């Protein structure tokens, strides 16, 4: 099929020129890095046949908006990472594993913050209370954010969570026991991290 390399229901590679793309209904899995680096891809229609979106499937694409159907049960790491034009992610309300809030992607129970839409123009973001994990590459490539705050409920901040956020200057981590990956701020060693030591004291790292 033109523009798509499909093997046994898996979309292995997109070979087209971008723009608005409709994925064929014969596809059940969007493979790892299938659209990686497709800067001219602005819109994609994911059919109800798709159950899995692989790691880095749309990494560094030109997507402006993406809609995830109810059929998708697994989204791999950094599937929509470093999409610097992406302003909103929506999830079908009948999806059992994922949901969206304010255009960002979460696990259905709201405990894992999976992906911030990196093209948003807001300069501040407060991770909602109840989130326990800030996921792999969650804020990767955000252009406009200067300040982010994570609540006491956050237990883990994973690899590359704030990687290459070009405007980021401060991250406030309110959980005194929050585990922060050594790679969470990869490429941004100059970010000021404010960590809660106890209820009355902050320290600057």
Annotated model-derived regions:
Residues 13, 184-186:
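Short, conserved catalytic or adaptor-binding loops enriched in Gly and charged residues
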Residues 1-7, 15-29, 39-52, 61-74, ...:
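Structural signature of tandem-repeat unit edges
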